[in-house]
Amino acid sequence: MLSVTIVLVGLEMARSKVSKRDSKILDILFATTELYLKTGQPVGSKTLKESFCSDLSTATIRNYFAELEAEGFLKKNHTSGGRIPTDLALRHYVDHQEECPEAEISAPIFDKISQLPSESRNIIKDLQKATELLGEILDLPTFFSSPRFENDSVTNIQITQVDKQRAVTILSTEFGQIFTDTLWLPEACDTLSIKRIEKFLQNYIRKLPTNEELSKKEEHLSMSLYNEVVVRYLTRYCNFSEEDLYQTGMSKLLKYEAFKDPEVLALGLSLFENRRQMCELLNIGMHKGRATAFIGKELSDILGTSNPGCSVITIPYYMNRSPLGALGILGPINLPYKEALPLLKLFANKINETLTQSFYKFKLSFRRPLTSNCKLSNEPILRTEYSSIKLLPSKETL
């Protein structure tokens, strides 16, 4: 008899060449996996018979279970006696989905996606909107990576006072990037003074006349803050070692049964909050050029960590056929893979269309992060006038 492992390696390609019994084992595995993903509960022989396999006796199903368990595709739940698919079974199930017709996407979802912009200069903000919508539909945390876009321009500055000698500055750009800094104020300032300085700098950035009359002290402080913020911004813009990462919806994990276990929740949150690891997964997904699932132990094998007990799916997005980054979702092991995969593809296609339209209309270009060796150089330091970043908005935004 052909072993279960050989049957599964071939998946659908092997169906026409194997015995009816071996094909039935494959059906049992996928039916068990699908039922587990739907309910999140261990699957018993009686439940499987009632749901998918009415032509088989419970004894026959248990025999198939035993064979699949011996091959490492199912594990027994000691409380209920039902079976749970292993990471290996889930991997074969996900690979199998590529051979199946994609699940239908409802009209309301298409309507929501159609409301996303068809072209835009505010690229990062629109990518955030798209991933927020994806997370809302799937009820899962979402994230995406992005390169730095050339010819961006600073459009606004906000200053929030923390106390009399500390303030948080927020810079926003035309392409939707946001940068924050906490700055030390050389002299104590009151709230009204900070607000006058903020309004003065907002007009200064936009080359607009200002009605704010600043004292000598406030004028000196405003330019001191401006110079500090601009230098920090240019440093970030010109020197970055990894793609920008944007994440949202972390609290959605709390809705899932698996994450009610404090240890599993801590591992999942730890992964989601680790920028380096998330960027690594997105980078792998981007270079694979297709939707890629990382399931359970696969994550620990790639990242060199303990098994986080969750799954991640990523998919690349493009601008004029050039890969820009990837977007993804994170959730429990029993993710709704059948629904999530086509939805991710749909969102990626929409983003591709928007970015390609924007590429031609706004002449967009971008830069990848560069890793550099920390060595002293005799070359002159990069001067700001040679940078493609602009401190003032382009004419189209004025």
From Swiss-Prot:
An example Gene Ontology molecular-function term: DNA binding
GO biological process: one example: negative regulation of DNA-templated transcription
Keywords: Repressor, Stress response, Transcription, Transcription regulation
Gene3D superfamilies: 3.30.450.40, Winged helix-like DNA-binding domain superfamily/Winged helix DNA-binding domain (1.10.10.10)
Pfam families: HrcA
Signal peptide: none
Record InterPro entries: GAF-like_dom_sf, HrcA, HrcA_C, WH-like_DNA-bd_sf, WH_DNA-bd_sf
PANTHER family noted in UniProt: HEAT-INDUCIBLE TRANSCRIPTION REPRESSOR HRCA (PTHR34824:SF1)
NCBIfam families, A to Z: hrcA (TIGR00331)
Family: Belongs to the HrcA family.
Role of this protein: Negative regulator of class I heat shock genes (grpE-dnaK-dnaJ and groELS operons). Prevents heat-shock induction of these operons.
Name listed for the protein in its UniProt record: Heat-inducible transcription repressor HrcA
Organism (species): Chlamydia pneumoniae
Gene name per UniProt: hrcA
